[in-house]
Amino acid sequence: GYVGLPRVVEFGKKVPVVGFDIHQKRIDELKSGQDHTLEVSPEELAQSTQLTYSANLDDLKSCNFFIVTVPTPIDEYKQPDLTPLVKASESIGRVLSQGDVVVYESTVYPGATEEKCIPVLERVSGLKFNQDFYAGYSPERINPGDKLHRVTNILKITSGSTPEIADYVDEVYNLIIEAGTHKAPSIKVAEAAKVIENTQRDVNIALINELALIFNKMNIDTEAVLQAAGTKWN
């Protein structure tokens, strides 16, 4: 997808990596050197020399570090629909091995990784969390279509299920993140940070939209107001 592809392309420039998607048509497209989302150019795809693509789950058995970037939509009642996350966790559980690390990037509520995803991994794999396998959370900050803010120059929050795994996850992301990383003290802190980021942006947009309606009735140029207000330092 538009979140996972830029990430896996960058990793493919550094280490052997498998880009997995359940849709064979998408895999065939990427193998041909094209990306219909236009997030990654044919030239960038070609530069990722250690990247392979697959829709075959068995091809993930040789992997030891998994990054999950599935969407988290809402249902008809406007509640988080974690079905894609659960299904992805079930798939990984089938190929999970001793010592593997699973990192989630999808937007979730604080606690979701450990409450919803980890139990699925344990049930399907038969392995024990923080004994046989480990987890992390590193919220995606991709802005689709933005050619200025790319994967490598956006600071990345990382976290892990133990202090040692947190260090390891941070090291892995630092392979590709030129802007640096911020290692959160826990998975829940990283999850909560993502919620705050999204909430702050939505609240700001809603506030300005409301103010713009008022300014319009007062014949005041909203853009001029924002430019003036933006001169304050805090």
Over which residues does each language-model region extend?
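Structural/interface elements that position substrates and couple domains in central-metabolism enzymes
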Residues: G1-N234
